[in-house]
Amino acid sequence: MPLHPWLPGAMVAPTPVSALLHAVAVVKSGVFGIIRVVGYVFGSDAMADYSLNDILMVIAGITIICASLLAFRQDNLKRRLAYSTVGHLSYIVLGAALITPLGMTGGIMHIAAHATMKITLFFCAGAIYVNLHKENISDLNGIAKVMPWTMGAFVIGSMGLAGIPPLNGFVSKWYLAIGSLEGGMLIPVLILVISGLLNVGYFFPIIWRAYFKKGGPELEKYGEASPFMVVPIMVTAILSLVFGLFPDLFFHFFELASAISNTIFNGGT
């Protein structure tokens, strides 16, 4: 914020494109660029000497909280997910602004962690729309009974973004918190806690409606979405859990994040 308005507007794109925009390609290139500028163009010493990291930290913190609050106001499911993306990108920026090795590691890890969780949620939103023709949260009453696998994956993705263990979102946020304490900063930890609660706040009503509110009679004619949609959803949801339990499995996320962080702070030594 305040350069975010294009991102919620981009959610009108088809679901695969939305997932690509919000979870993998476009937005992540921006935050990775910030990491490169902080680490290599300015360097941690210059960032600290001129208090540039403090300015960046304030911007990231405000964006995290404000984007979460704006997500509460969105009835359109994909639009709520879009504001969630705005907030979670700022976790990555916050990691860079901490200019501590563990903070930077946590921010870099959140690039990958957010990708699996947010792809899961956007795929779920797409499956709901294709299968039930519903896109507003207020219309999702009782859908877990007809789409149990889709909503189960949605719960996993939501819990991960809220930072609930043992999902990968908890791991990256844990390193962000430890990195904050490493630098003697408590306010970023407070921001992480508050934003985690806000994440629960704007995801829980969706889950509550789906599982505990009675749906309309029109749901009786529907079943679970096509396996061509459900299988990718379950794969990304399971990856969110697996990479939470084993961050270095397959792609060595923690090892790569630590290596990049060490390169920035130690010049590759």
Model-identified regions with their sequence ranges:
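Cytoplasmic/organellar membrane-interface segments at the starts of transmembrane helices
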Residues: 145-149, 204-269
